[in-house]
Amino acid sequence: LFTPISAKMIDNVHLLEVIDALHPTPAVSGHPSNPSSLLRSKYEELDRGWFASPIGWFDSDGNGEFRVALRSALVTNESTTFYAGAGVVEGSDPDRELLETDVKLRALLGPVVASTKEDL
């Protein structure tokens, strides 16, 4: 599921200003964002890194396209860290949310395992 947003930019507004105003999305940050952010910093032990960050491109004419990085991996020489999440809301079933996250992470794991085997 996604909600495409398109717009004709106002001349004195840069695309990155719009991205900044839209980030983080309520789907990954909660709403309203300030109380949600405080709760996350209190209870969430993991640094989200680039998870749910806007990724995309823009050019000198003001054209561009961005997405929210809902699944990602941070690869270093020493380790690989995968990021995925589930939309936990009132009434969510924790077991189903965990299963959803597991399915998302497995989709990321396959290509990394395949490339590691080639390097051996």
Regions found by a protein language model. Give the residues of each.
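Structured core elements
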Residues: G56, R67, L74, T81-Y83
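Hydrophobic alpha-helical bundle architecture
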Residues: S37-E65, A69
